Amino acid sequence: MHLKRLLPALLAVILLAVSLPIAASAEVVTVKINGFDCFRNSGNLIVYTEAYGPKTNTNEWGVEAVVGPDNKVVSVGGNDNAIPAGGFVVSGHESDTDGKMRTWIQQNVHVGDYVYYNDRTMLLTVSTEPIDMSAEVFYDAERAFNGVNVTRGENFLVVYTSSKGKTTGTNEFGYEVTVEDGLVVSLGGNDTAIPKNGFVVSAHGSSIDWLKTYVQLGMTASYDASAKTVKFSYNAESLERGMAAILETLPPALEDAKENFMYLQYDVLEQQIAEAKKLFADALAAHRNDGSDREFATVCDVVTDKVAVIRSSISESYTVQYRAVWVRPSQKSAKEVDAYVKELHDAGINTICVEGNFNNGVIMNTPKDCLFQRIKTFNYDVLQAYVDACHKYGMECHLWMAIMEVGHSKGQYYSDNIAYKKPEWLSLNQNGTPHNPDDFMMIDPANDEAREYLVNFYEYIIRNYDIDCFELDYIRYYSRSDLDFGYTEAAFKKFEEQYHYGVTPTYDTKAAYWEDWKKFRMSQVTEMVKAVREMIDRVRPEVLLSADVVATVNGATEYNYQDFVTWLEKDWLDILHPMAYGDGYGDDIRQQVKLAGDQCMIVTGLGVFMAELGATEMVRQAAEDNQNGAYGDCFFEGSAYLKDMAGPALMETVYRNQAISPFLDPNASIKACLDYMKGRIKDVLVPFEGITADEGEKISALIDGLKETVSQGKMDGEKLKELHMALKAISGKKAKAALESDLYRAEQITCVTYRVDQNKLYGELALPKGEPFDPHPAPGPGETSKDEDDEESSKPSEESSQEESTAESTLIDPVDDGGSSTTIIIVLCVAVVLAGAVVVILVLRKK
């Protein structure tokens, strides 16, 4: 917990103001901080202390002020500054849309000034003179609100009472504070339950910042309906009441875990609760005996941290689970990749989703005539280095590819990009241009030629790199707002052929054809998902297919034309990553878990890059994911995960048990799931009388028998059925549910492996395949090898020939056209015989 440098004399004025920088004309200026000891995101102001490390590790797009242990500024300028002992660094980033914090530092902070921060109110204060820090630590915060029980609009602050209904009815784009009996009892979320003896304060936009900055658990709260003001008070009484209330929630939470037979370290948790209660009781006694407010508040902060750890530890810690990060590679050599992968492994990560295309290029070696060329700043095969390093450390390597978003027209090396070479393949907005505010060059999903080329390129990758999963990102249109995309001749033609409106669609949401125009574009994206699924099943069925999607169904379909519900219904995906960056996505994750069933794992994308979240919030969200049925988490992104120290916080709580990824070794994963099930029986169910000792022995023996049959990622059907019958016979519903949940996690793995085997049998026998293209060919006469001249080999060929023109549109044909008809007939006959044999075997097994 950071040292408090509180400014009570200023707080009365500051807390009445909107949380924006105050004009710089005064001798004292104050600004809101975005975070502490975390990744400096776009437009952020971050404070870095010694706890973060020796340096700030920031890039060149900001400026920093170094503050000594006496709170005096010793230097202003640069980035990646050393953090002084006993001092801190204030780091600002510049953004046109998110905040100009570099400019704020340059205008307001000078060598010799005094700087103080308050991590409770998230305020930074700069003064030309030192400020007396001996005053009280408490404060009041008051703000006008927009109304009682009204619809929450943009930047609104609304008070909801029980006369509104059971919940606030708000969407996911806000933040809410619940007040019960005049006391703040919960923070965060949306569509919150409204207590009969209290109210909910609901914020959107800039009002969210105000609530997050000034309101904390335990504060007293009231509102004046006639004046339309809400007031929160932080004082000794509210701190005492709040801490006592928080501590009292822990024993019931632990008791509830016991009743549901959660697999926890109950003796450890009970001891931690007792220690936290004693620490608070001692601090309270000292405060009542003329102790200082500051010392009392500081100890309460320590207790709050301990409570957060305890709460997050009241969560399952599975031994088979995705603990993944997205990574944009920046390493200059395979050796650096190895070191980085190991660092992530040691921080609790078991899967890396490495970005395959950015900076107008790709990270793998490609044929000379390919429309995708390796990023010129890399002189080695980055993808191969990540595959090798991940497998060396027992981690899955997923290739994260942006599908429709292929480049940036204003970026470096744009002339090497597929969008530059094939502008006719780009998606256009209603104005007939491919341009959008993010400068994303997006492929038109309705263009069949483009789709075929992309799928052929992905086949080339899958044939030549031992990736564990192919991940579809930007598998959608550019998000609809003032601009809408998909207005191409290819799309118009196909739309008319399907719907026969006799008009060319325009951006008119009230048009008679609008719903069909949306549906049509969703179908074009869906066709790409289907094509990739079919290609993988034919070429390397053991490769998983995943997709990164908008976290809400409505947001995906209405604004991005992304119909992932259909993809789940068709069983095309093995993993779905809802990008739940922020808070309040619990209902959406539960809905997607239900939609996915046992055929697809939900692995939630969490926004560790967001300064307002931090390690504690990542732990809470990971625990919530467990509760909601997700099969793990994927953090965006790797560097932020490491800088935010999320790893140590997670490994102390939700990730306290080491976990293997599900599909690197499916046999080992299934056995680990079954061992976890046995552990729950031995350590929880029998001791807490969920089942008898005899039942425990019988079920454990059945589990052991099933483990012996695990092979090729599957379990023996008869023994699995026998175990299910034994679980069904358990009389206690909660005990039965706990064990069935464990077995279900093992069965989810088998569902994917059955699909793999099915496609190996019925897909690969269809036609003989040509030799996989070698991305590392031996140099021909007069050519240099890739090792000697990697940069040259990645450049597009400048020769013009009919063969190369054909290659530009088809990349490489994966099928060998040189096979004789006799060979094909023989292979087809063999395929028919084998398929018949498989059907007979399956029928006999069912009998």
Question: What kind of feature is each model-predicted range?
Answer:
Residues 490-612:
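Glycoside hydrolase catalytic-domain groove-lining segments
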Residues 336-362, 464-468, 573-576, 632:
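Catalytic domains of carbohydrate-active enzymes, especially glycoside hydrolases
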Residues 320-324, 332, 399-464:
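Active-site-adjacent "subsite" loops/lids of carbohydrate-active enzymes
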Residues 773-820:
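C-terminal low-complexity, Ser/Thr- and acidic/Pro-rich disordered "stalk" regions positioned immediately N-terminal
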Residues 829, 833-847:
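C-terminal membrane-anchoring or membrane-association module
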